[in-house]
Amino acid sequence: MNYPAEPFRIKSVETVSMIPRDERLKKMQEAGYNTFLLNSKDIYIDLLTDSGTNAMSDKQWAGMMMGDEAYAGSENFYHLERTVQELFGFKHIVPTHQGRGAENLLSQLAIKPGQYVAGNMYFTTTRYHQEKNGAVFVDIVRDEAHDAGLNIAFKGDIDLKKLQKLIDEKGAENIAYICLAVTVNLAGGQPVSMANMRAVRELTAAHGIKVFYDATRCVENAYFIKEQEQGFENKSIAEIVHEMFSYADGCTMSGKKDCLVNIGGFLCMNDDEMFSSAKELVVVYEGMPSYGGLAGRDMEAMAIGLREAMQYEYIEHRVKQVRYLGDKLKAAGVPIVEPVGGHAVFLDARRFCEHLTQDEFPAQSLAASIYVETGVRSMERGIISAGRNNVTGEHHRPKLETVRLTIPRRVYTYAHMDVVADGIIKLYQHKEDIRGLKFIYEPKQLRFFTARFDYI
């Protein structure tokens, strides 16, 4: 495997340091064994998320100085609008403060209580907004996506037979829309093939069902298509992205990932009537339709960053840096979700902590142990993130119980990946020392963000 060097020079740095293990243990205890509740100053290498943790370019910083902070009609909005229309091909764009702002708008605009939303695996905030507006989420991702050890391409594809069965059983009129994520975060950052997007479009169009993409990591998805799908090897990333969205009616976007910024998002659609309603609704929750809760400078940085993300050298390095970490861990026998996706390496906590049951929260405990032993912050993505069934109150029990090592864009080097790998490999050699956890505080909504735990 060829791992390309960073396609950038570092112009500004932030000093970080490793606090002693006994202090890390104390900090973890104070945080209730929830890595979300740690203070960033106590983190050596922060792999909690790739959301808003990107390093911006010199051109983006220059653009920040060109912020038009007019309350309405900001020139930066029009720059962002033109950029998204050109690259994605959608007719309308509504800016939001981040991705979940767009999820909130779409859910209110598109869902009637009692309808179904089908998608290729749930995501935490996305499903929350869908259910909050009365929908029932139905997972129609291919079965292979739930098998952590299965190494095949495009595990994020929608199972067309599952989709057809849902249409036959529930009726097309009772399906609000299809939520197609590119890539599928909780499956390990798995991509969706262009062939599958095209097939989903053909099937839904025949039944009058709309398709909205979660476009958060669309550039990473495009890279996998270029790398692995026949007929796209000679196409540019921008060309692939544009074709991807030609099979959708709109999308939600968290600009904090593939737009290479620290804040921002947007909702896209082609339907004029929906756009009119979205402009009315965004004023209530975000702000004027020309800023959506964002400063002008942030919209400018997002427009510039989205173009930078289309550069092949950037996205090749981005994906292969993640793959480098995964390959090191796999070579040492550490169980991971395969194949390695575009934004993170997912540790398979079921196999890593095989001495713990799912009710002992192995992924949560593993994430806490990783911080204590290595100074690296990661994130639980298992039963805690899945939450509870709204009707029964029982835990959702995902087949995948993982810890996500999420790599921020343009922030860390291969040397940092070596440090992460070495620390986790060492921890794996003493995995039986990892103890199970129990709730001492469980929030009712999106519990993984603020829950607290203690050892059983």
Curated annotation (Swiss-Prot):
It catalyses: L-tyrosine + H2O = phenol + pyruvate + NH4(+). Its EC number is 4.1.99.2. Its cofactor is pyridoxal 5'-phosphate. Keywords: Lyase, Pyridoxal phosphate. Coiled coil: none annotated. The keyword Lyase applies. InterPro entries: ArAA_b-elim_lyase/Thr_aldolase, Beta-eliminating_lyase, PyrdxlP-dep_Trfase, PyrdxlP-dep_Trfase_major, PyrdxlP-dep_Trfase_small, Tryptophanase_CS, Tyr_phenol_ly. This is Tyrosine phenol-lyase.
